[in-house]
């Protein structure tokens, strides 16, 4: 469990983090969490490349492999990091440099791999974003790759494999970058990874899904790799009988901070703790004005830093359930909503009393907190739109029958999702960064879904994502009418935070007015079932950046595009960094491996690749 960490730091009120404005006068304590050190604080403009404190080098080694695990008391062959699920916490301070060596030990299933550092902008280090087929070729089994980058943001996040569905089998862990907070707290409880869990291999489940158009239903929900699945060990050898809810013990009169991360495969969760309110102080990597709520939706990939204060009205032997239910109305009992226990320090070990869910929780829906309630501390104004945005440019989510373009994939016609016309399909051996820097070609196949953003640094681009639109006349690859299915879609952008100009239910129409004055800013947003989101971000980070639904099955089945941002600027950046040689070597090694091992063993790419 994390303990409170006190940093000797100084405080100023800089204008865009200007060193001249810093007075170095404040210390980071339980009474001044908005301070950090060396004049850096909650108001520092962390989007400037140099706007982070001087830091140290922090090194980690992560080995990805397979082993039998039973986080909810039922055994399955999972994917682990350093022999554990979830993987170990990557922990650093704002301004540190992380050097992480990732080793691929998937020697039995012939899987490549790559690790994505979710929410880390990778400013001018696009090739370290960890997306096979987009920013790199996969790491071959038995090989390793070093990811080294400076962390200029702070808060709570996670790392995960971005190779097909590996993270759904367990290949992920938390990231904590310590920095200032927008409200005071006493003790840091660390990251809480909230996840749905299956008892079958995610790759196999997805194959069933795309051939039958039936989504796989999770078996249980977990916090930090702990959960409770009801089974009988006398009748099922895989039922180990060792299962536990995640528990925390709190002390009266104390403010606790924790970061909640939805690391699920399919479920957006509605989260609450019986008898308690909590205060949101950050969304993704963005500190906000404190917002007190009693219930919170957490989409896949979203993070919230939260403060919970123990209730003086409760006895010190009280205990309470933590709840996480599927957000979709009328399907809230898809898994048991009890996911953990909060105990006050003198409470025993018995289960808390169960409080029946009210209509408030049953009908809470899948919406993010109201946009007007999420006010970033560091203010940003949205500039004028540089890109064309007619209705035909909207990113519309649909479902249809398609065939994967890879000749080695023999699945034939399958049910695939798409974002604007075609499902994404990347070539692991020919990632976009390779095309832009080594091959220097604009030959991007249609299914690689490239959208070029060749604008000047500082300009703004706007995009609309719709899940409620009229598909009349739109047909799939086999001439069947496209379907619009009511599903929540948590969309994640790599390489940027975006600003949310508007968000809601129903169709997006031209009379909707954008909020351009310091709107909510984050990297993952929920598009409600049959809803829309209007976003904008600033051109300032050359590279190939994935934008995708973070329901793992949806991303695997095609809901993604990639932005090619200032493509001509990427090669000079990589040449200056001296990384093109290693990049090419990794692709050559992967291509040789894939041709010599994967294809003969029928272990070929069977989905979008991401």
From Swiss-Prot:
GO molecular function: copper ion binding; oxidoreductase activity
Pathway membership, UniProt: Secondary metabolite biosynthesis
SUPFAM superfamilies per record: Cupredoxins
EC number(s) per entry: 1.-.-.-
Domain of life, per lineage: Eukaryota
Sites carrying sugar chains: 105, 111, 262, 277, 330, 356, 401, 409, 427, 602
Effect of disrupting the coding gene: Abolishes the production of pestheic acid and RES-1214-1, but accumulates isosulochrin and chloroisosulochrin.
Signal peptide limits: 1-20
InterPro entries, per database record: Cu-oxidase-like_N, Cu-oxidase_2nd, Cu-oxidase_C, Cu-oxidase_fam, Cupredoxin
Domain Plastocyanin-like: 67-181, 191-344, 425-568
One Pfam family this sequence matches: Cu-oxidase_3
UniProt-listed PANTHER family: MULTI-COPPER OXIDASE, OXIDOREDUCTASE TPCJ
Family: Belongs to the multicopper oxidase family.
Purpose: Oxidoreductase; part of the gene cluster that mediates the biosynthesis of pestheic acid, a diphenyl ether which is a biosynthetic precursor of the unique chloropupukeananes. The biosynthesis initiates from condensation of acetate and malonate units catalyzed by the non-reducing PKS ptaA. As the ptaA protein is TE/CLC domain-deficient, hydrolysis and Claisen cyclization of the polyketide could be catalyzed by ptaB containing a beta-lactamase domain.
Protein name in the entry: Oxidoreductase ptaE
Phylogenetic classification of the source organism: Eukaryota, Fungi, Dikarya, Ascomycota, Pezizomycotina
């Amino acid at each position: 469990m994390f303990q409170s960490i006190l940093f000797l730091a100084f405080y100023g009120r800089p204008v865009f983090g200007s060193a001249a404005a810093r007075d170095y006068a404040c210390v980071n304590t339980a009474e001044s969490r908005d301070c950090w050190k060396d004049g850096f604080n909650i108001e520092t403009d962390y989007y400037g490349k140099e706007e982070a404190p001087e830091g140290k080098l922090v090194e980690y080694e992560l080995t990805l492999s397979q082993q039998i695990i039973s986080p909810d008391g039922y055994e399955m062959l999972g994917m682990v990091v350093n022999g554990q699920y979830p993987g170990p916490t990557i922990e650093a301070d704002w301004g540190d440099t992380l050097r992480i060596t990732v080793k691929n030990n998937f020697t039995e299933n012939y899987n490549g791999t790559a690790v994505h550092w979710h929410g880390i902008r990778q400013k001018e280090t696009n090739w370290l974003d960890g997306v096979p087929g987009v920013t790199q070729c996969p790491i071959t089994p038995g090989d390793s790759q070093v990811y080294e980058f400076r962390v200029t943001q702070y808060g709570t996040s996670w790392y995960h494999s971005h190779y097909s569905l590996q993270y759904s089998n367990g290949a992920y862990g938390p990231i904590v970058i310590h920095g200032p907070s927008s409200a005071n707290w006493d003790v840091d409880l660390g990251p809480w990874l909230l996840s749905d869990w299956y008892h079958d291999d995610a790759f196999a489940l997805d194959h069933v899904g795309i051939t039958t158009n039936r989504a796989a239903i999770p078996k249980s929900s977990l916090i930090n790799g702990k959960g409770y699945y009801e089974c009988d060990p006398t009748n099922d050898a895989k039922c180990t009988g060792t299962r536990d809810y995640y528990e925390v013990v709190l002390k009266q009169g104390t403010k606790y901070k924790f970061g909640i991360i939805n690391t699920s495969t399919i479920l957006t969760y509605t989260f609450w703790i019986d008898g308690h309110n909590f205060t949101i102080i950050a969304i993704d990597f963005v500190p906000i004005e404190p917002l007190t709520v009693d219930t919170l939706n957490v989409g896949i990939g979203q993070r919230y830093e939260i403060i919970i204060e123990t209730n003086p009205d409760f006895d010190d032997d009280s205990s309470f359930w933590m709840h996480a239910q599927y957000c979709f109305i009328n399907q809230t009992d898809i898994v048991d909503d009890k996911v953990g226990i909060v105990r006050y320090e003198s409470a025993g070990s018995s289960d808390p009393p169960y409080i029946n869910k009210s209509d408030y929780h049953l009908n809470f829906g899948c919406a993010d907190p109201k946009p007007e309630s999420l006010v970033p501390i560091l203010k940003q104004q949205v500039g004028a739109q540089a890109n064309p945005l007619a209705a035909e440019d909207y990113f519309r989510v649909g479902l249809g029958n398609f065939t994967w373009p890879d000749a080695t994939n023999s699945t034939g016609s399958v049910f695939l999702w798409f974002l604007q016309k075609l499902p994404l399909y990347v070539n692991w051996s020919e990632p976009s960064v390779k095309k832009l820097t080594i091959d220097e070609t604009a030959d991007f196949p249609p299914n690689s879904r490239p959208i070029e953003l060749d604008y000047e640094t500082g300009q703004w681009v706007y995009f609309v994502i719709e899940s409620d639109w009229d598909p009349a006349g739109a047909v799939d690859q086999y001439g069947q009418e496209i379907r619009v299915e009511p599903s929540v879609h948590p969309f994640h952008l790599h390489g940027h935070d975006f600003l949310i100009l508007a968000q809601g239910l129903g169709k997006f129409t031209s009379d909707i007015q954008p909020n351009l004055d310091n709107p909510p800013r984050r990297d993952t947003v929920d598009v409600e079932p049959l809803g829309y989101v209007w976003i904008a971000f600033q051109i300032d980070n050359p590279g190939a950046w994935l934008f995708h639904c973070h329901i793992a099955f949806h991303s695997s089945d095609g809901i993604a595009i990639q932005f090619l941002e200032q493509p001509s600027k990427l090669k000079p950046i990589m040449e200056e960094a001296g990384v093109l040689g290693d990049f090419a070597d990794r692709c050559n090694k992967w291509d040789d491996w894939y041709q010599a091992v994967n294809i003969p063993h029928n272990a070929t790419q069977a989905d979008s690749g991401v």
